[in-house]
Amino acid sequence: MNTDRIENSKTTENSESMENSKGKGNSESMENSKGKGNSNEEESSDDSFSDDHESAETRSGSYPDFGMRIYGCGRPVRLFVAGLHGDEWKDTTGLLKRIKPPKTGTLALIPLVDCGKYISTLNPDYYPGVGKKIVRAIEELKPEIYVELHSYSSKNLEKLAGKNRLELIGVPAYSVLKEGVLLGSVSPWIRRKYFPKESLCLSFELRKGSMESRKFAACMLEILKEIQSLDEFIEYMKKEFPAQAKKAMEDYQRFYGEI
């Protein structure tokens, strides 16, 4: 399975594919995929992501899409990921595949991380295992803004947004925004290990099967792809969702000790 594909925002549907071997002894090779329906060549899963945020490659003719896309260049770098486990890709992957490039900075997208067995991101084994492509992207791109898209069944709403979540699960409860979309922080495991305190790390939960949830989440992503910093997002939340912003900040300070 090729997990290192990157799609250029400037390419068309019949894009050229490029294998990046920058920094290695092997020479760069390029295969023209225009007009081809398949290829038997695979890149090593240990290859690094390209340092050039405008170079790109995608896996064609397949869905779900395991490829990575990078739009734009420069700072800030925003990394959005979706379809982290189970069948959540059905509600989230399409949102990242349709998003447009940012006006400034870089936007890196992993539309689908894994569609296999459901393993919670709160499980310490998730990111070193199933989510290792996320870790590799974070290590190499060093994003200031990191966003995960998840989806939930209505029966699990209380588990995610209930007031006793911290006592029962060990992490703060999600805040309810609009149209069934919930907002919280990402797993403490990845937040503490890979991001400085000034980074913006968010987790959205969409209600499964809800077009309204998808539309609202898409609007939030359009805002976040242009956000420059944690402080800017806090100001936006204070203006648009004051009650949720207050709760989120209090929960974060209680859990992490600072914001």
Role assignments for model-derived ranges:
Residues M1-I259:
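Structured catalytic-domain cores with a bias toward divalent-metal coordination
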